[in-house]
Amino acid sequence: MLWNWVALVGGIISAVVFSYILQAAYFHELSLLSAVILGIVLIAALALRAFAGKKSVQASYFASTKVKHELRSLIYRKLASMPLNQVNQQSTSSIIQVASEGVEQLEIYFGRYLPQLFYSLLAPLTLFAFLIFFSFKTAIILLICVPLIPMSIIAVNKIAKKLLAKYWSIYVGLGSSFLDNLQGLITLKIYQDDAYKAKAMDKEAEHFRKITMKVLTMQLNSVSLMDLLAYGGAAIGILTALLQFQNAQLSVLGVILFILLSSEFFIPLRLLGSFFHVAMNGKAASDKIFTLLDTPVETQQSAVDFEAKNNVQVEIKDLHFSYSEEKPAITGLNLSILPNQLSVFVGKSGCGKSTLVSLLMGFNKAQQGEILFNGQNALNIDRTSFYQKVSLVSHSSYVFKGTLRENMTMAKIDATDEQIYACLEQVNLAQFVRDNGGLDMQLLSRGANLSGGQIQRLALARALLHNAELYIFDEATSNIDVESEEIILQFIQQFKQQKTIVMISHRLANAVNADCINVLDQGKLIEQGTHKELMEKQGAYAEMFQQQKDLEQIREVANA
């Protein structure tokens, strides 16, 4: 704002000098020396205006950049402070939209609209205070016309606020639908439902187009009204000055100044009106941003550190959990997971295996019952200390874009190359890494340049480097090659003597050597024991095991 005002002062000085030169020339009073001096002053005033204008742009840029950085940092810190189950409740597309375009809109609000708002109030008062010495009548007419633009802005604001709130709501909804359909495109293709979803998206896109056109129409009408008021007000001021000059009530210098400076009364407010539309869009975005920032974080009551130095024992007591009231996912579950053993959970799809993992990891919170880790209630354990002692290797392990070293050191930031290679050796990846550039090997997002088995082995190596006390494998061997599956299973068998291991598996052959097999059905524990004990019992486990064995034999014959 200050630099804008300095630029205005430079403009006033240049207008005065230029007007004086014209007046002196009109009355034949301009000497060569005075012309040179006045020319130098004019150039200096114009240079001051240009310099101040440049500094104003720079100040606006630095202010808006700082606001943008601070807002995105606040959003990141807010999401980082939330427990994972609360983060999962947030819409991914909504977060992306408010953190990207929403913040960009607010950047304009803070970087341009607010400085222009204060300058728009200061500029007419400065010009009035200067021009009043030449003609009070013309100066007061110009000043009276100035409030007409803010009045039009206030009138438009009432319409714009509701319209832009609706616009952003539809925009975020369209983004959510697009992301959901894109992520589920393969499933839609399989079930031949993609055409239906395409039509639904066409309707949403058309709805968004209509609301966008309404916003543009409102903005164009508002701009036209402000142009009429701005240039109409300037024309009235100039006409009044000319009439006073005709009646010998205003000097040549004065009339030229009014001609040159009348528009300066209105240009700042006219620019404010232009920024206003973007600012209102940013205001609508800010409602979404501050709704996220004001979301209460689910905090733990008297959180304590997780005490797990060597052995971890897990006790589950009367556990109940459901995603909806109609269908419970876990019902009255009671069991113990003993330290330094391999405990495997099996069952049909939808029996509650992965739900149990989400409860063990704290991604979801049980409605009833408790989970105890070494006697400590999971609800009272500090999440940071908990995740230092527990590692999860899921069927969808994520590989980040960057070097292999960067991916590995996420588990241990100060890990040496020797420690990383030691972990890679245990999953039979060390030689592959050496042959492909070593630890500086570039990995694509989601490990696009690795096979599914290599991704899982890399995830296991990363978990090993983390050196947790409790390892949870959630379908870690599903949909990978036989070699990688055997490497992972052999490692788990060797590793179970040192750590507590929980494994979720749909393939029962992987559970044969487990110390304890837990069979789930509709969220309940229906059988428990070793492979031998459960086969002798001839219950649900034995039936599923035999069915899978028969299917695998049929597949082998078909592939032979």
UniProtKB/Swiss-Prot annotation:
SUPFAM superfamilies: ABC transporter transmembrane region, P-loop containing nucleoside triphosphate hydrolases
Sorted UniProt keywords: ATP-binding, Cell inner membrane, Cell membrane, Membrane, Nucleotide-binding, Transmembrane, Transmembrane helix, Transport
Residue span, ABC transporter domain: 314-547
Any Pfam family the entry gives: ABC_membrane
Subcellular location: Cell inner membrane
Predominant localisation class: membrane
Gene Ontology cellular component annotations, sorted alphabetically: plasma membrane
Disulfide bond sites: none
Record's bilayer topology term: Multi-pass membrane protein
Location of the ABC transmembrane type-1 domain: 1-281
Transmembrane segments: 2-22, 32-52, 108-128, 138-160, 168-188, 223-243, 249-269
GO molecular function, one term: ATP binding
Binding of ATP, residues: 347-354
Signal peptide: none
Family according to the record: Belongs to the ABC transporter superfamily.
This protein's name: Uncharacterized ABC transporter ATP-binding protein HI_0663
Lineage per the UniProt record: Bacteria, Pseudomonadati, Pseudomonadota, Gammaproteobacteria, Pasteurellales
